Structures are given as C-alpha cells and as structure tokens.
Amino acid sequence: MFMIKLNKTLFVLLISFVSIFSVTQAQEKKEDKLSLSLSLNHDAFFGFNPAVTASYPVTKKTDLTFYGIQWGAGTARAWGNWTEFGLGFNMKAGDFAINPQLGFTMGNLLSSGTNQPGIVGDGIVPNLTINYDDKKNIGQFYAGYYAALRNKTEAGESTLNYVHYWLNVGRRVTPWLALGAHYENLNLAGGKIKGGGNTNSADYYKWIGPFIQVSKGIGGMRFSFGTDLTDDETSNSNSDFYKLSFFFNF
C-alpha cells in the first residue's frame, strides 16, 4: 500500500515537473523571438550617440518595434541631456523592410531652444526607416520630423523644429566587406518665437561621401566620411563629414 502511494506521489511530481518545464520552455521560445540591436555611433556633429532597437514578431511579415537614442551622450548633453524613445511597426515586402515609428524626446532643444530646463515631452518625432537587403546590395532611407511638443519658452525665446534624413546605398563585394555612398541632411525647419515671429529655416549640414563596412556574424562596423555641402558662414557645422558606427545584433 505504501509503495502504491509512493509511486502515485512520484508520478504526480513527475507530471508537475514536466508541465513546469514545458511552460518554461514555451516562455523561453517566446522570449527568443525578441531581437535586439546595439549601435555605438559617433559623428562630427552629434558626437557620441548610442542607439538600441528592438523588434518582436507579430506575424511572419510584421514586427512590433522599439528604439531609444542617447543623444545626450555627445554634444546633446547641453540640450538637457537630450533623449529619444519611440515605437512602431515593421512590415516586410520582398527585400524591403518598412518601419514607420513615433518617437518622443526628453530635454530642452525643441521646447525652448535649449534655454529652459529639460522636460519630458520636449518633442514628438514621426519617422520612417526603409531598409533594403538582397544579400548582395544594401541600402537605408531614414526621415524624421522633430517637432516641439510643448512650449516652455520665455519672452524672445523660440521653439525649434528639425527635419533629419539620410540615404545610403552599397554593395557587398565580399561576404564581409561592403562599399557604398551616404548622403545626410539636418535642417532647422523653423520655430515659434514667444512674443511674435518665427525662427528662419536653415541647413545645419549636408553630408555626402563614401562608406566602408566590415561585418561578420552578429557584429560589424561602418566608417562614412566626406564633405559638408553647406556654406560654413550660414550653417551650424563647419566640420568635414565623418561618422563611425559599431553594431551588434542579438
């Protein structure tokens, strides 16, 4: 009788263990679907600006996406430690991945032109990223509109709005080496001055030049360089174009 009860107890424990293990495995499989990418970026205007992106598949051709950029790690430290976070939806169409997102900034660049303390909800950033990869050719288009979400200006101060976009295309000449070209523009798209009037629009920079990318497995780096097409006397950037990125995919 004792042995029967013991066997039943062991059987129940075994079933419980198998059930818990199965649930744990299922949860781990779900968690494994989450993809993360880390980009350690450094350029002539923003300085160091690391970014993280995340995606979780909803269907075979769609993903829920998230992103964050620490602009304040570089020159944007003076803009209320400017920070950006957003989310969106990625759609795959052949060799294209189309990812509209909506971001928000924290800091003081957009809400007061860097004059007042940093705030949550400094700006809103509707943006679009389109990636192309057919195993041989690669490309990316990005466009974002940085608009002041809150107005924290005092008399004579202005909110600021920006348009930031780039396009790069390249070709893999070997499995680990890609060569291509990059164009990027940052434009001040105006703003409202407290007390009346608007801030004039102006190009901060227009970068153009080649890039070289080396990669293997989950990581790699890209170096882009060239010239700034804007007039140094009217732009906010007087440097040549150079940008270095280290990227890792998990």
Predicted features and spans:
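Short glycine/proline- and aromatic-enriched beta-strand/turn motifs that initiate or cap beta-hairpins
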Residues: Q25-G74
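Outer-membrane beta-barrel proteins and related beta-barrel translocases across Gram-negative bacteria
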Residues: K33-L38, K92, G103, I208-P210
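Outer-membrane beta-barrel transmembrane domain signature
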Residues: F46, Y56-K61, N90-D95, P117-F250
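Mid-chain, structured segments of secreted extracytoplasmic proteins
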Residues: W71-G107
